Amino acid sequence: ALHAQMPSDYGCVFTGSGDYHHLSQLLLNRLPTQQKIQLIICDNHPDNMRYPFGIHCGSWVYWASRLPQVEHVHVLGIGSPDISLKHAWENHWSPLVKRKLTYWNTNVDTRWLNWIGAGRSNRAFTSADELMSAFLAQLDPSLPVYLSIDKDVLSPQVVNTNWDQGEFLEKHLNALIDACHGSIIGADITGDVSA
């Protein structure tokens, strides 16, 4: 029903609270399947968690990784313990093992990914500056980009959200957007404070 009500052409979509980040999945479903894209997500959480009752804000990345038009998913800025050993069993492993999904994190112990054969799907850094520099150095300019930003990736010095927050500053998002200039085919922003 929602699909039929959406315009055929739209710019960046603002989805409100981070509780609704899974609406990105609906927007991705609207993209043509014959054109491969890279999905770049800025989020303090992996949003790749197991959830037995369908899709929600913490599980949508798994479903997005399965879309035929999605060549690769990069989740940048993860600082949440959701990807630590304590929560390893909660993560969907298949997109990580298949190297369809890469976690780009700061200051989280993710050695367990090596133990399951997914070490190459994890990029660990000690700062947001290092993370963004490394990501931009490997960014594939030939693939169109769908960009999804959850404001919880930003430091509390920049913005307040309802979720635990990351270390990114405005300069990190600006550098990413500048690097993707001309390649972005869709975008959404979530993470407003819930009322």
Predicted regions and their residues:
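Conserved alpha-helical scaffold segments that buttress catalytic/binding sites
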Residues: A1-A195
